């Protein structure tokens, strides 16, 4: 079931030029990324039911913020790990009570759900992470790289799903979207060069204005 962390965060930086409200779903994640800032509170911990917000409670709190924020950003964990029906139902209700923009943050492993939400115009933008040059790596030969950065044992399909999601976001062509990479200290500069080159080629292909950000690595606070 879709549940939410009760601490909403006001942010000026996640969506440049907009005052946004960041809301984390407490629904787990299918990655265990190096230096994840949400791991201790939202992923590694077992959810405590009485501390979580239901979709109804989240919508009630969000409705009181309408007009105060330009956008709401839904993150996780991995927000799209919930069922397509549950996501659609929830975001339809968000549209009814919140007049600002709706952004979803994702690791890209659920392109089908992402495509569905974009086609229904239930979200205005997507912030997607391209953590590795998935178009170049081999899940078997580069298993140690995957383990070190995303903490998961991938398959070819896993990599293809992420690339499909990145393609969707760039083709959707919203200035509210972002493709992002963290400059992980474990990786050589060549990794980041290859990712940036891949994104630029897609942007040229679709004449897309979606920005790409190579962000510095900030270790989680202890």
Residue spans for each PLM region:
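Short, conserved beta-strand segments within well-ordered enzyme catalytic domains
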Residues: 22-24, 71-75, 103
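Glycine/proline-rich, flexible active-site/cofactor-binding loop segments
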Residues: 54, 67-76, 80-90
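N-terminal [4Fe-4S]-dependent radical SAM core
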Residues: 1-25, 29-47, 65-66
């Amino acid at each position: 079931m879709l549940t939410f962390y009760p601490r909403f965060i006001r942010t000026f930086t996640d969506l440049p030029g907009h005052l946004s409200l960041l809301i984390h779903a407490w629904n787990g994640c299918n990655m265990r990324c190096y230096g994840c800032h949400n791991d201790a509170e939202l992923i590694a911990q077992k959810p405590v039911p009485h501390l979580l917000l239901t979709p109804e409670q989240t919508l009630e709190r969000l409705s009181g913020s309408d007009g105060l924020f330009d956008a709401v950003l839904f993150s996780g964990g991995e927000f799209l790990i919930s069922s397509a029906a549950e996501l659609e139902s929830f975001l339809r209700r968000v549209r009814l009570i919140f007049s600002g923009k709706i952004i979803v943050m994702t690791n890209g492993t659920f392109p089908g759900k992402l495509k569905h939400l974009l086609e229904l115009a239930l979200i205005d933008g997507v912030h997607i992470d391209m953590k590795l040059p998935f178009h170049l790596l081999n899940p078997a030969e580069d298993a140690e790289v995957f383990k070190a950065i995303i903490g998961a044992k991938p398959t070819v399909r896993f990599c293809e799903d992420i690339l499909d999601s990145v393609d969707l976001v760039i083709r959707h062509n919203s200035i509210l979207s972002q493709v992002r990479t963290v400059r992980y200290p474990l990786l050589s500069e060549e990794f980041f060069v290859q990712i940036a080159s891949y994104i630029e080629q897609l942007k040229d292909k679709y004449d897309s204005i979606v920005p790409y950000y190579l962000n510095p690595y900030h270790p989680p606070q202890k």
